[in-house]
Amino acid sequence: MKRTKQINHASFRKSWSARHLTPVALAVSAVFMLAACEQADETVSMYQNADDCSAANPGKSEQCTTAFNSAKEEAAKTAPKYASRADCVAEFGEGQCQQAPAQAGVGNTNAESQSSGSFWMPLMAGYMMGRLMGGGMGGQQQPLFSSKSPTSPANGKFVDASGKNYGAATPGRTMTVPKSALAPKPATTSTVTRGGFGESVAKQNTMQRNSSSTGSANRSMGG
């Protein structure tokens, strides 16, 4: 029997590669896509204080207290600061403001206020805390603020120091957020003018709506 002398080696190699490498490539791609998804989001719980956290997580009282205290320390550094109580109250409502602790991150932008320690900041309305797989509790937390001023975009909402909105200021609920939401925010280095933080919240709301609309459009097109 004669053997064919001419073999299309290029075609053979291409066929072998397609059969043997394509499934491997697909598997590797799937792994990377799964890893990206796992790194993109975090399930967090919203609490008003350590007691709320402890009630929802029996046996985790110590971790709840640690997370709450860490969030308060973070709030002192990153919360919006105002040169007067009136400016803070106009933004957050009566009974929602306190004097900022000394050395709470504000630079020497106002010598008189700095020397008298009269910077003002909103009270921490709650905090979000990360959760690990299997019901464990993460080591990250983020202070949250809320306004009771009817004219503020943050009225009745949980917002972080950057003005990002996390929905109704209802302790005890959980939600999925980007992992970046738990990243420490920059320390406040200057005071904001009356209404300035509300403008930040409004801008963040617009960005979030636009992002949601873009995501919905991509999904509808199969993207």
UniProtKB/Swiss-Prot annotation:
Transmembrane segments: none annotated. InterPro entries: Biofilm_formation_YgiB. Coiled coil: none annotated. It comes from the Bacteria. It holds the Pfam family DUF1190. Residues 202-223 have a biased composition (Polar residues). Residues 166-223 are annotated as: Disordered. Belongs to the UPF0441 family. This is UPF0441 protein ETA_04310. It comes from Erwinia tasmaniensis (strain DSM 17950 / CFBP 7177 / CIP 109463 / NCPPB 4357 / Et1/99). The lineage of its organism: Bacteria, Pseudomonadati, Pseudomonadota, Gammaproteobacteria, Enterobacterales.
